[in-house]
From Swiss-Prot:
GO CC field: plasma membrane
Name the UniProt record assigns to this protein: UDP-N-acetylglucosamine--N-acetylmuramyl-(pentapeptide) pyrophosphoryl-undecaprenol N-acetylglucosamine transferase
Known pathway: Cell wall biogenesis; peptidoglycan biosynthesis
BP GO terms, sorted: carbohydrate metabolic process; cell division; cell wall organization; lipid glycosylation; peptidoglycan biosynthetic process; regulation of cell shape
Sequence positions that bind UDP-N-acetyl-alpha-D-glucosamine: T11, G12, G13, N124, R165, S200, I254, Q299
EC number: 2.4.1.227
InterPro entries xrefs: GlcNAc_MurG (IPR006009), Glyco_trans_28_C (IPR007235), GlycoTrans_28_N (IPR004276)
Catalytic activity line of the entry: di-trans,octa-cis-undecaprenyl diphospho-N-acetyl-alpha-D-muramoyl-L-alanyl-D-glutamyl-meso-2,6-diaminopimeloyl-D-alanyl-D-alanine + UDP-N-acetyl-alpha-D-glucosamine = di-trans,octa-cis-undecaprenyl diphospho-[N-acetyl-alpha-D-glucosaminyl-(1->4)]-N-acetyl-alpha-D-muramoyl-L-alanyl-D-glutamyl-meso-2,6-diaminopimeloyl-D-alanyl-D-alanine + UDP + H(+)
Gene that produces this protein: murG
Pfam families named in the record: Glyco_tran_28_C, Glyco_transf_28
Length: 382
């Protein structure tokens, strides 16, 4: 395997699995060149650069809405495919793999138009439009969840799990070893550490609910590490200051998420497929607030799957947002404080999360890529 294109964009839920696969390719093929093909408008350029990957941005946007906006987005997609074809011809990849999102449509379609083998990875039980379309033109469809197989041609589907970055896998393994030594509890019974994450772009509803809960969290001695997203960073920092909390780590984006998971006793976050996969590999109990406007409400599906396994509590966004009387239906502060105080329950939830983890998912995807290339008499050698 000499050259590989990984293509996706939009949110961390698509991007981070691609970065995990890039790590595994580099581990097996240290001399391989990996090109990350993304969009010009999302966070993928910065994240790829931090991972040390070559990057090309395409002028593509999601096809949303109607009328002129949809027409403009479709035109941009056409231009994106044309440019992606140029990139594929110049880079000459052995294989291209898409991870969903609008950029992946252009990248994978360009690879197939140029006669290159390609695959996609689907993180969710209910695929988005990009992967639904591409699933009929690629050699393999790698699935996080086996029950997604009915959407794609069965002969092309390979259940792999959702790839998680190496540092998180290592942190999860270390946490499991530490918990085993201490009978399932990984740190002091007095620890009250809450990690708040709204996804790679932040989550205003979660940010606002946590700021409202700060007085109770402060009084209960809860330590906080809070990823706010860029848009809400100053507003949330002001909320912490007003609550008299100066020791909390309040960051727009957490670069070292593996350390954040290791630090935390409990995680409050969205229920995107990649977040759920990371929580499982890290063995972390969670309170999940699904994004209610996700396509086909797939985050609620993800959250209930984790909750049914005993690894999470689910609180819907409408229940933590103020109602007509100005009060939320669910007192999030009480939920968090009571759960953080129950060490035995946290340990049980952590074990349940770890049992769901697929730490070898990235390796399974690269195995599948190798199988595609072996079937074509691939040029690259390890």
């Amino acid at each position: 395997m000499r050259r590989v294109i990984l293509t996706t964009g939009g949110t961390g839920g698509h991007i981070f699995p691609a970065l995990a696969v890039a790590e595994e390719i580099t581990r097996r093929y240290p001399k391989a060149r990996i090109l990350f093909l993304g969009g010009q408008y999302g966070p993928e350029a910065d994240l790829a650069a931090r991972a040390g990957l070559e990057y090309v941005g395409l002028p593509v946007r999601g096809v949303m809405g109607r009328g002129l906006r949809a027409l403009a987005a479709a035109g941009a997609m056409g231009l994106g495919v044309w440019r992606a074809v140029s990139v594929v011809r110049r880079f000459d990849p052995d294989i291209a793999v898409g991870f969903g999102g609008y950029a992946a449509f252009a990248g994978v379609l360009a690879a197939r138009l140029c006669g290159r083998p390609a695959a996609i990875h689907e993180q969710n039980a209910i695929p988005g439009l990009t992967n639904r379309l591409l699933g009929h033109v690629v050699q393999r469809v790698f699935l996080s969840l086996p029950d997604t197989t009915g959407v794609f041609p069965a002969r092309r589907c390979v259940p792999t799990g959702n790839p998680v970055r190496t540092a998180i896998v290592a942190a999860g393994a270390a946490g499991a070893a530490g918990a085993a030594e201490k009978g399932g509890v990984s740190r002091s019974a007095h620890s009250r550490r809450l990690l708040v994450m709204g996804g790679s772009l932040g989550a205003r509803a979660i940010n606002e609910a946590v700021v409202a809960a700060l007085p109770a969290l402060r009084d209960a001695g809860v330590e906080l590490w809070h990823q706010t997203g860029v848009a809400d960073w100053e507003r949330v920092r002001a909320g912490y200051k007003q609550a008299g909390i100066s020791e909390a780590r309040v960051e727009a984006f957490i670069d070292d998420v593996a350390s954040a998971y290791t630090w935390a006793d409990l995680v409050l976050c969205r229920a995107g497929a990649t977040s759920v996969a990371e929580l499982a590999v890290a063995g972390k109990p969670s309170v999940l607030v699904p994004f209610p406007f996700a396509t086909h409400n797939h985050q609620l599906h993800n959250a209930r799957h984790v909750a049914d396994a005993g690894a999470a509590l689910v609180v819907e966004q409408k229940d933590v947002s103020p109602g007509a009387d100005g009060r939320p239906a669910v007192a999030l502060d009480r939920v968090l404080v009571e759960l953080l105080a129950d060490r035995e329950r946290l340990a049980d939830m952590g074990r349940a999360a770890r049992a769901m983890g697929r730490p070898q998912a990235a390796a399974a995807v690269v195995d599948g890529m190798e199988a595609i290339l072996a079937g074509r008499g691939a040029r690259g050698v390890r």
